[in-house]
Amino acid sequence: DIAFRGGMIKYILDHDLYFKDYVLSYTNAAFLVNPKFSFNDGLFSGYDAQKHAYDKSSWSFQKDGKGLIKRDDTLKNPHCVFQLMKKHYDRYDLKKVSSITGTPEADLLAVYKAFAATGKPDKAGTIMYALGQCHHSVAVQNIRTMTIVQLLLGNIGICGGGINALRGEPNVQGSTDHALL
């Protein structure tokens, strides 16, 4: 699941299919991260192996003299959230995603193209998921990758967009709200 959506994120970023005005206005993509922050080998900066704890002082944004977060609205600064995200998702090329998911590269590309086409002011795309996404040890990351896709495409807060959890017996309302029953 994470590899599949990681590949979609890479595809959106590599082909400039993100909704730039939306991304600049409604996300932290332009925010400049502390240059001391890092993420290597699955560990964030500040990890103390002896204490098994983090010093989180590098986990911050750069601020100006007034205490406001610095921005790079060109999204080119290597310390902006957008560039750090690009670097992180660069590993999810079609070949790797195909080998992890078992999905042929051509099929991945077809899905990525179709869904990325919703990243325009006159389009919308929704992601619907069921309990399976939540019943993994990486459930938070599953939902987070859905959120990143939808924020990049501007599909949050618009009619026909969003991320919608469908539930079974505990709450059938979600299914009926979406006219699926």
Which residues does each PLM region occupy?
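Long, well-ordered, tryptophan-enriched scaffold segments
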Residues: 1-118
